A protein has these predicted regions:
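Membrane-embedded alpha-helical segments of transport systems
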Residues: 70-75, 100-104
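Interfacial aromatic-anchored transmembrane helix boundaries in multi-pass membrane proteins
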Residues: 21-50, 61, 83-88
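Short helix-perturbing small/polar motifs within transmembrane alpha-helices
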Residues: 10, 18, 38-74
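Hydrophobic transmembrane alpha-helices
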Residues: 1-6
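Alpha-helical transmembrane segments and their cytosolic interface
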Residues: 91-134
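Hydrophobic alpha-helical transmembrane segments of multi-pass membrane proteins
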Residues: 35-39, 66-67, 94-102
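Juxtamembrane/disordered regions of integral membrane proteins
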Residues: 7-10, 14, 21, 28, ...
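Alpha-helical transmembrane segments and their lipid-water interface positions
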Residues: 18, 76-80, 107-115
Length: 134
């Protein structure tokens, strides 16, 4: 939710810094593998967020949230494939894709509750949030 908030309400640079800080936190608290997988997932989800915002039409917050969650899990799968083997990483794909759908849906529901209140307190610095309907 934090990176999605930064992409929508701040700017892409802030979102990138958050991805890097989250990966650094994972590295320091859970080790090199967790830091690497966090970076892979965060980078791919940020890239997907940016691509979705570049579309010439408005998309729903649900699609935005679920796409980010699925991209995050796919990024982690790619990172795991690079560290382990493709076959080992692929065995986790169905579980992570289902988890991405569930977590993305939950993220959407929480965002739908939080973002309108945040908009009233802190006006968006980015026009990106106008491309997503929550």
């Amino acid at each position: 939710i934090v990176v999605m908030y930064a992409v929508l309400f701040l700017n892409r640079r802030s979102a990138l810094y958050l991805v890097l800080l989250k990966a650094l936190f994972a590295l320091l608290t859970r080790g090199v593998t967790a830091g690497f997988l966090s970076l892979c997932g965060g980078a791919l989800s940020l890239a997907v967020f940016c691509l979705l915002l570049a579309l010439p039409f408005t998309i729903t917050g649900y699609i935005f949230s679920v796409s980010g969650a699925l991209a995050h899990n796919c990024g982690q799968l790619l990172g795991a494939a690079a560290l382990l083997s493709d076959k080992m990483a692929i065995t986790y794909a169905p579980i992570l894709l289902i988890a991405g759908l569930i977590v993305g849906s939950c993220t959407y529901m929480v965002s739908r509750l939080i973002f309108p209140a945040v908009k009233r307190i802190i006006p968006p610095k980015s026009k990106a949030e106008s491309k997503i309907t929550f």
